[in-house]
Amino acid sequence: DYLLELFHGPTAAFKDLALQALPRLMALARERVAPGTRAVVLAATSGDTGSAAMRGFRNLPGFRVLAYYPGRGISAVQEAQMTTMAGDNLEAVAVDGNFDDAQAGVKAAFARARGGLPPGVLLSSANSINIGRLVPQIVYYVHALRALRRRGALPPDAEADFAVPTGNFGDILAGYLAKAMGLPVGRLLCASNRNRVLADFLETGVYDRRR
């Protein structure tokens, strides 16, 4: 068995790998497609996404980040990472509720935006609904396969199984997309903590958003 180390980013969260790339990709896209506009990036977070998104977009011209997190249920360290991070374009907002309530607020903002935004303003997300979050995550599945083969730990024609600690399914979805693209991935094991939200959903077909 091998462990893929994804904690070497600036906030020590695995999401740093995608959220260091995403701001630069979005800055290039804005420059080419909508120069002179301002982008507001919303993030619903249970802790890690917020600080990683804020760190990635920190002081990036033309971008403002609003990270919404549950006022109860995240660790003091996670909250401190967001609320003490220096940056002229960053704001962390506590929501009275859980992660799903924070996410519902972000989704509602996108729904309202369909009615129109002020001129020169764009709205985007730092969550996994943004394909720009998932694409960089696909890369480290490819990297893992290559590293195993370079070490001789995986025969050239063999598949690799991945066990992925899973909260909101984004990371394991990147693995599924990598497999769909032809990467020799065998089983994708959805590892859940004692909250069991996804584990219960996969076993029963019922999703309990109250947790």
Language model feature labels by segment:
Residues 1-211:
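PLP-dependent amino-acid enzyme catalytic core
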